[in-house]
A protein has these predicted regions:
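Residue-level recognition of the N-termini of beta-strands and the immediately preceding loop/turn
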Residues: 27-28, 100-102
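Glycine/aspartate-rich loop-and-adjacent alpha/beta segment that forms the canonical ThDP
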Residues: 107-123
């Protein structure tokens, strides 16, 4: 699993460049959430460059773009799941099925919303 905030267009473009350089032949499943005050279309466009599949969710209710709305911005196949923990489970399952790298990106709030921060503290 790779975790990167990639919470704005510039950071998303940088992540996409790094993914294409370092993991150019590695299939990827993306778990993504974007805040309403960010340019979600540009973030999705950049992240679509390396993602074979996207699972879209909401990391911060009230501030986050709805998952369904975000999923429509991706050029790659994308599914929507409003509940971030369910979205994480879906993304993990897809990554395992596709033997793909799971990339968590698009919001600085997403790791905490899916419980990764707690897993790291408990490890």
């Amino acid at each position: 699993m790779l975790i990167d905030g990639a919470h704005n267009p510039q950071a998303a473009k940088q992540l996409a460049e790094n993914m294409q350089t370092i993991f150019q032949n590695v299939p990827c499943v993306l778990l993504c959430a974007v805040m309403r005050d960010k340019n979600a279309a540009e973030v999705a466009h950049a992240l679509s460059g390396f993602a074979g599949q996207a699972v879209c969710t909401v990391a911060e209710p009230g501030r986050g773009l709805p998952a369904e709305e975000l999923s429509k911005l991706f050029a790659c196949p994308a599914v929507a799941e409003e509940d971030p923990k369910k979205a994480y489970e879906t993304a993990k399952k897809l990554a395992k099925e596709k033997e793909a790298l799971l990339v968590v990106a698009g919001s600085l709030y997403l790791p905490e919303a899916i419980g990764i921060e707690k897993e790291a503290k408990d490890a």
